[in-house]
Amino acid sequence: TQEKSTMQTNHKRNTQHLLVNPKQCIWGNVVTDNLLGVYSFFPTQSIDFTELAPFKKGLLNGGCGIVDDELHCIYVDDTYAAYGVLGVTHYAFNTDTWELIEQSLQPKSWNVIATETAIDPKTGEVFGEFYSANLKSLEWGVIDYRTLTRTTIAKAEHSYIALGITNDGRAFGVADDGNLYQIDRTTGVETLKGSTGINVKDEAENHFYQTGEIDPNTNEFYWAAKTANGNC
């Protein structure tokens, strides 16, 4: 059987440096001028996307996780953010049929918005970096997508754009400073492992949506990277 992991990706990309496990099937929220929805693909030099669920209502940009046979996602609509208004919607898809089975607005549930999430391949726990209830800080926590509640472990030191968990439970993430860190899932302590060599933020300190995932079979970290100038 093919192992599957989920990630959000923004573009058909050059993957000439991806040399690991070309049979690894990945699920992702693809957002391009021509493609919009949940797709599957393989990390090969020439990537073809297969549509699983058409989804044109927004981006799955606030975190996601698989619970049993359901893919749960958060969409954050920031159209009116300048006026202090954020739309938060919880979506769930059946991963056998890819039918949309849940769509619910979550007014004022800002603490379920994640910059990035990752699933423990052994326990199914969804660990991530989330906004605080007042949106003023970032914090590590564990979310239950069934009840839309989460814990708070500790304040986060960096803002993360890619996150994954190995098959022995270690969490790693790429922060928006372009560095790779290991995150202690109990204390939230972030330990620098090294630079990725990729410049993510532009001069205004902004960056594109992107994500990552760790293959639970090989512990290889896949990162759908997008540089500050928009290159994939």
Residue ranges: model-predicted function:
Residues 25-29, 71-75, 81, 125-128, ...:
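Conserved beta-propeller blade signature
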Residues 33-40, 80-91, 134-142, 177-182, ...:
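Structural motif
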Residues 42-45, 93-97, 144-148, 184-187:
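Short loop/turn segments that connect beta-strands within beta-propeller blades
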Residues 48-57, 99-107, 151-156, 190-198:
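Beta-propeller fold detector
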Residues 78-141, 145:
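A generic tandem-repeat structural signature
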Residues 208-211, 222-226:
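Loop/turn-rich, solvent-exposed surfaces of beta-rich toroidal or solenoidal domains
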